[in-house]
Amino acid sequence: MKKLLSLFLTVAMACSLAVTASAAEEPAAAASDPDLTGSIVILHTHDVHGGIAGYAQVAAQKQYYQKCGAYVLLFDAGDFIQGDPTVSASQGETAVELMNLAGYDAAALGNHEFDYGYDNLVKLSRTAKFPI
């Protein structure tokens, strides 16, 4: 039984190497960026709940569509200042700073934007480079 299993694994490994080697030899098709001149692209996030790891990807998407010639709008539909320990510890300031860097154009208020009180919300709206 061990010999049969060993033979099976050897054949499976050889097949996977052969498939991988042949795939590497084929040239990848060159993907060209689409011409989106005159187009409007709307990107949005919602219920991020302090998940700050995704803001770099959001910024990259906005930059990509701008590079393709599109006019890009980036919005958030609320609940961005609570959830992640880093964002919660700063009472949303970290999220707003990252949203500034990502190039958000506007953000709506969700119920969690009121978790730290009205005064904090006013402070965050002054820090933001976009209307909240």
Kindly give the residue locations of the regions a language model identified.
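Acidic, metal/ion-coordinating pockets
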Residues: 24-132
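Sec-dependent N-terminal signal peptides of Gram-positive bacterial secreted proteins and lipoproteins
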Residues: 2-23
